[in-house]
Amino acid sequence: MERKIIHIDMDAFYASVEQRDNPELRGIPLAVGHAEERGVVAAASYEARKFGVRSAMSSQRAKRLCPQLTFVSGRMDVYKAVSRQIHEIFHEYTDIIEPLSLDEAFLDVTENKQNIPLAVDIAKAIKQKIREELHLIASAGVSYNKFLAKIASDYRKPDGLCTIHPSQAEEFIKHLPIESFWGIGPVTAQRMHSLGIHNGEQLRACSQEMLTRQFGKAGVLYYEFSRGIDLRPVEAVRIRKSVGCEHTLEKDISRQSSVIIELYHVATELIERLQRTGFKGNTLTLKIKFHDFNQKTRSITQSHELTTLAEILPLAKGLLKDIEYTTHPIRLIGLSISNPYEKNEE
């Protein structure tokens, strides 16, 4: 039986919740985050995005792009509560739900509680319920696998609804920029470009052997995605083992002050991801990749969960002291939290 998969992605979720709850913020460029010198944008409204403001951008750069930008502090408890309300709507149609974060999820509606034959009708109903009951906007992608459903949900944002039928998949993928493929970030995209691969059609022309040689196990996925193949199931119980982020630097750095500043930005983004996913762990890992692509990792485990910048940044600095980089310029800095933490309850 051909699967019916929906990907739901809330549009500018944090910012939209703030605009919903505060009429004075509606219609203006809005950023959720901190405006101070070293602050980072956690989310940007569509009014702000018109000026080029994006999440994970430094607040200073965001204000240069949009001087009239308004900042508000995030309310993670509210976002989590709204996310639970969204999932209650999902559960009216299926219990096979794989959350990716507070604001997006996959749904397998092949067999659904309402016995609705068309997945696109379920997607329409979910979007309408979210709009009417929660006064928020969602985009939805519908297809026969996770890869295409996620691509479809991004296609007509905001408030989008896109369906990719099996008969349309090859043509759709052919024109897809390589950066839009799942698992291809800026560094991998740059490598793809160096190999003459810029879109789905060019990726499809590559053999599995060549892609595996260049990209390891990920090459198999790229080979299959370019052919519209994705056999991964929607995992109703998705156990996350870690949360992390990495920054590949525009220029290699070796000056201590520059490294510390970049470490701060990575740590700040890590905190935002921890809050968004709700993940809790007590092991911090620092990853440093040097200009020659050699890399080192250092880890430290605490007796309690690591959730704040005040805890994580000093630990990261301590791990950094164990790595010699003044004579080996750094090209990438990464931080991750792992070892899921469960508090024992008496």
Positions of PLM-derived features:
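DNA-contacting surface of Y-family translesion DNA polymerases
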Residues: 7, 180, 188-332, 338-346
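Gly/Gly-Pro- and Ser/Thr-rich, intrinsically disordered tail segments characteristic of DNA damage-repair
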Residues: 1-214, 220, 337, 341-345
